[in-house]
Amino acid sequence: MTERRKELDIEPALVPQVWEDAVAACLAKDRSRRPQSAAEVAQRLQLAPGQTRTRMAPGKSSNRKALLVGGIATLSVIALAGLYFGGLKRQAKPVSQAAAIPEKSIAILPFENRSEDKANAYFADGIQDEILTRLSKIADLKVISRTSMQHYKSAPENLPEIARQLGVAHILEGSVQKSGDAVRVNVQLIKAANDSHLWGDTFDRKLIDIFSVESEVAKAIADQLRAKLTGQEEQVIAAKPTDNPEAYDAYLRGLAYMVKPASTRGTTIGAQKYLREAVRLDPKFALGWALLSYVDALSYLEHPGQPTAAIREEARQAGETAVTLQPNLGEALIAKGYYYYACLKDYGTAVHYFDQARQFLPNSSRIPESLAYVARRKGQWDRSDSFFNEAARLDPRNVNLLTQHALLYIELRRFPEALRKLDQVLDIAPDDLDTLALKAAIAQAEGDLPRSAAILAPLRPVAEQSNALETQIYQAILERRPAQIIGRLKEILATPDPTLGYINGELRFWLGWAQEVTGDHAGAQESWRQARRELESFLNEQPDNFILIGDLALTNIGLGNKSAALALLERAAHAITIEKDAIDGPIPIEFLARGAAGMGDRERAIVALQKLISMPYDGALGAGVPLTPALLRLDPMFDPLRNDPRFERLAASQARVNAK
């Protein structure tokens, strides 16, 4: 309504907030929320009988006057609504959602680090997160998830606009100053509509007493917002997760790695290091065990993680320990569910734990987000879409959530919808490299190489950003001009990062492919031999890593070792199936199509492509875009099939996705 008022040049003083609220109520979609009489409209406009009786004589004239006031109020609201919608019709601009914002809603901005030691920024982040976590466990509040806050400053000037973007009525700002074991926390609660200060306080405590600050702040905010707390919620707000300040400090350091906007292999390793230290210092620290389990399961699942049996076992043990220590800890239940989802692909058990967690974490976006992932793996595309939308209502500016929603559309080859989601990401993080690379990968899949080249040209991804780097290499290969990228790849691989594991070998496979496209057969053979050595060294500890197995199969085809390649392709097909995973299950089929084409087995390659071209899935190479007719036309790996009429028909077709 505020935005519409500005568009129509209505002075704020002439449209009090109470009138805007009354208009919103009259126009509510839910009939039960609308005023049911003129008197109720008058009451909403603060013209209730309690206000008007002192000015009225008793008797019938009082009733008539009340009706008159109510009638005038109603007509005024109708007139204002007419002005509102008249302007909307004339200008056809989006309407602010401020009218729908619940009063008991809050977002907590990043806390400012005022410590002299700037390395203490992790502590300020942690205090913000812990206060938010406590509030999010109150069912009567709407609390925006932390991940939507990451791209805001600690004390921005445009609080009303930020609140509108997040769909909340209140904002909490704060600062933290840490010196040794002394901590000062300053907070202030602001009503966003008029940028007014509702409550604030300063807390000076020792590190060992920091939990009391988090509890007091959460309780004060709940009181200010008039939230109704159950007995269980009061206990949760007052809970002390550990009695060991060193363990809590290590936990906050690990948490800081997890809240970084860009997640990389390095951030995962950093988080694991500090979380292991936290639970070593306090083996009864359930929250620490829960986060360690979640990080491990995430690392096991996501490319370029290292899905080793050791990481999977640590995720299991950490999750079990967390649930045993605190059976009603929502974070522990989520971690247990994520272990079953990511490590075992036991979706039924995963959903059971996620559903259990809901009653303890009513504001957690991670629960519907996790349910979206489960539905996607089961091929329940519409259900996944719905869960992503539910998560977005709790976490509207979560870059990872928006990206994952875009990936759902990419897997379905619904590229326009994917691009809209990616543009939302870029509105929040304009220079996000992975998002730009994904947009370029979509352009490649649509056959628009000039568009993808323009997006990729300014980017300088490093080895750790392997998806973006491989998208650049693929661009050069599709253009059949990879000479420049070969030089960059050699430079990157001259000092390989050991934390990347098998990804170094994967990049050497790409180097060999690029060299082969330029006609440097000898150089390609040398790169592939080195790639094979590096990839094979990880196979024993990652026996079910179908991406690693597929990379190794294609490398062996490049080296002319068909028997080894066929054995690996069969192994990849057994490591993951469509029945177990609708997204990743088709990846071995793409490896087979590429491998069969390279070996000259047209029949097997074309049969595989006929399956893939209408199947939703996550692509085998680069950014994970599925094969499209345009990519069949452009990709040199399919050159051996070009004279076959069946392949030509596939390459000339329009992609029609069978999402059943």
For the regions a language model picked out, list residue spans one by one.
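Long, domain-scale regions corresponding to catalytic signaling modules most often appended to membrane systems
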Residues: 28-29, 33, 40, 47-91
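Alpha-helical adaptor scaffolds
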Residues: 338-342, 373, 407, 550, ...
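TPR/TPR-like (Sel1-like) alpha-helical repeat modules
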Residues: 460-462, 529, 570-573, 606-617
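Terminal, low-structured helical/coil segments at or just beyond the last alpha-helical repeat
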Residues: 628-660
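C-terminal lobe helix-coil module of Hanks-type protein kinase domains
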Residues: 1-54
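C-terminal structured "cap/appendage" subdomains that terminate the fold
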Residues: 594-633
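Acidic, proline/glycine-rich low-complexity intrinsically disordered segments
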Residues: 67, 73, 79-515, 520-544, ...
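Acidic, Ser/Thr-rich low-complexity linear motifs
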Residues: 237-238, 305, 499, 537-545, ...
